[in-house]
């Protein structure tokens, strides 16, 4: 193992028994050979479970939708990339030449994906308890800053934060119809996001309200919220 990877292990607070797992977790798909996408998939599932379990215990009075919104804040790409930068993770990534030249080692989505891959690698290396311990340790500051007040956000904000947590494009809203007299109009809005095959729709007495209704419908269609809070 190189000295540099030993340094990264100290920053992560974890020493790998199988160092090939660590190297694989740091290997982007632009690099020749095997890459970290499967580990990222596994790490994403573990991260969501550990965060959800911790929130379930920490906020016993919270409703399902509130817990989902808190978790989205914890696991969003911005949060993960910030943690990754704290570990100087970009210095250790294995990137293809094109990705390296374009500054991929600084890109939020690549950093967040690599951190999730490391979570998956730790799980395979030492099991669930080791992965849980590292996730909770890394997210201590974020956990401590959460309150249920954080869930009192409008649907558009909640949808945006959820999509950012998945490194997805932001939603696009379009007014498709306006009905009624000038003093009593009804606006019809469609919300388009890449994760859904169909557009979500909303209507209201203003464009702003119609957009909020469409965003709420999108959250339900995504399974993030159940619409029964």
From Swiss-Prot:
A cellular component term, taken from the record's GO annotations: cytoplasm
Active site per the UniProt annotation: 44, 116
Single GO MF descriptor: rRNA binding
Pfam families: dsrm, Ribonucleas_3_3
UniProt cross-references to PROSITE patterns, sorted A to Z: DS_RBD, RNASE_3_1, RNASE_3_2
Cofactor: Mg(2+)
BP GO annotations: mRNA processing; regulation of gene expression; rRNA processing; tRNA processing
Compartments (UniProt record): Cytoplasm
Annotated ranges, domain DRBM: 154-224
Binding site for Mg(2+): 40, 113, 116
Alphabetized UniProt keyword annotations: Cytoplasm, Endonuclease, Hydrolase, Magnesium, Metal-binding, mRNA processing, Nuclease, RNA-binding, rRNA processing, rRNA-binding, tRNA processing
Annotated RNase III domain residues: 5-127
InterPro entries noted in UniProt: dsRBD_dom, RNase_III, RNase_III_dom, RNase_III_sf
Reaction catalysis annotation: Endonucleolytic cleavage to 5'-phosphomonoester
E.C. no: 3.1.26.3
Functional note: Digests double-stranded RNA. Involved in the processing of primary rRNA transcript to yield the immediate precursors to the large and small rRNAs (23S and 16S). Processes some mRNAs, and tRNAs when they are encoded in the rRNA operon. Processes pre-crRNA and tracrRNA of type II CRISPR loci if present in the organism.
Family that this chain belongs to: Belongs to the ribonuclease III family.
Subunit relationships: Homodimer.
Name recorded for this polypeptide: Ribonuclease 3
Organism in which the protein naturally occurs: Pseudomonas syringae pv. syringae (strain B728a)
């Amino acid at each position: 193992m190189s000295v540099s990877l030993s340094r990264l292990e100290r920053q992560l607070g974890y020493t790998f028994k199988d160092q090939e797992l660590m190297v694989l977790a740091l290997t982007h798909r632009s690099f020749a050979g095997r890459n970290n996408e499967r580990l990222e998939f596994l790490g994403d599932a573990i991260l969501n479970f550990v965060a959800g379990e911790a929130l379930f215990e920490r906020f016993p009075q919270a409703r399902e939708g509130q817990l989902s919104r808190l978790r989205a804040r914890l696991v969003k790409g911005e949060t993960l990339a910030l943690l990754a930068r704290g570990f100087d993770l970009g210095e250790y990534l294995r990137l293809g030449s094109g990705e390296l030249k374009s500054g991929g080692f600084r890109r939020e989505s690549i950093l967040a994906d690599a951190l999730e891959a490391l979570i998956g690698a730790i799980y395979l290396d030492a099991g669930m308890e080791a992965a849980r311990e590292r996730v909770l340790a890394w997210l201590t500051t974020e956990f401590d800053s959460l309150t249920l007040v954080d869930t009192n956000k409008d649907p558009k904000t909640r949808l945006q934060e959820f999509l950012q947590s998945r490194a997805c494009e932001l939603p696009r809203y379009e007014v498709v119809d306006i009905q009624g007299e000038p003093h009593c109009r009804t606006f019809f809005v469609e919300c388009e996001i890449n994760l859904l095959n169909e557009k979500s729709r909303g209507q209201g007495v203003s464009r702003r309200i119609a957009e909020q209704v469409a965003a709420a419908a999108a959250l339900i269609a995504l399974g993030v919220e159940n619409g029964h809070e």
